[in-house]
A protein has these predicted regions:
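Acidic, turn-prone loop/beta-hairpin segments
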Residues: 1-63, 82
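Short, solvent-exposed polar/charged micro-motifs at secondary-structure junctions
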Residues: 43-48, 89-93, 179-183
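Ordered, soluble secondary-structure elements with a strong preference for glycine-centered loop motifs
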Residues: 48, 52-56, 92-94, 146-150, ...
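Short glycine-rich, basic-tinged beta-strand/loop micro-motifs
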Residues: 3, 72-95, 127, 131-143
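C-terminal edge-of-domain segments
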Residues: 107-197
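C-terminal, active-site-flanking charged/polar segments
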Residues: 30-31, 99-109
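Ordered core of a single globular domain
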Residues: 11, 50, 62-78, 85-102
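Active-site lining segments that contact anionic ligands and/or coordinate catalytic metals
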Residues: 8, 31, 74-80, 165, ...
């Protein structure tokens, strides 16, 4: 069904540029010429904010790797992607819950003894995440809270491997990853650390 819908839509969109071929193919596919078919419109039932967010995360990761490759002039054999530790995600959740009020956020996160031990590191992360949250609409932030970032990059690893002709390894920062360049600690929620080798 999906392939049929994609073909029907593409043929209709091609009709102004290659009318004869598009009409013939559209008629074979649907029984009516492309010129008589309605112009395709987006179907709101098929729109999914979470899927679009996940796609943007992969796109941003791809852009970041391309930037690193361009700057360093390397052709990596292995690309390691480090996803932020769970405690950083907890800080993101606190920022999301308390809004841009750093005092309220710090009060909430410092109630957690594990986060209190990380004092300065948490303070720096809160500043970065407050900026991140301010730049995004609530709908996007709502979708981000339900995203499993590690799973997104794992699912995209085949695409990334083809894109960069390299082996892709995805690690969680707090899962004792292979980290020869000590990059894992640089990961923040929705902005993974990257190491090329």
């Amino acid at each position: 069904w999906t392939l049929r819908e994609v073909l029907r839509t593409r043929l209709r969109l091609l009709a102004p540029f290659v009318p004869f071929m598009a009409n013939e193919l559209h008629e074979q596919l649907t029984g009516e010429p492309a010129e008589d078919a309605d112009w395709p419109e987006p179907d709101p039932a098929r729109e999914d904010d979470r899927t679009e967010i996940e796609e943007r995360l992969v796109e941003r990761l791809t852009d970041d790797v391309n930037d690193i490759v361009d700057v360093t002039g390397t052709d990596p054999d292995t690309i390691r992607v480090y996803v932020a530790a769970d405690w950083k995600r907890d800080v993101f959740d606190a920022v999301r819950e308390h809004g841009p009020d750093r005092g309220a956020i710090m009060g909430a996160v410092m109630d957690d003894p594990d986060l209190r031990e990380r004092g300065d590191e948490v303070n720096q992360l809160v500043g970065d995440l407050v900026e991140f949250v301010r730049e995004r609409p609530d709908e996007e932030l709502d979708a981000l809270t339900s995203v499993d970032e590690g799973a997104v990059y794992e699912d995209a690893s085949e695409f990334l491997a083809r894109e960069f002709d390299a082996e892709i390894e995805v690690y969680a920062e707090d899962a004792d990853p292979e980290d020869p360049a000590d990059k894992a600690g640089d990961a923040v929620p929705f902005r993974p650390a990257i190491h090329l080798e």
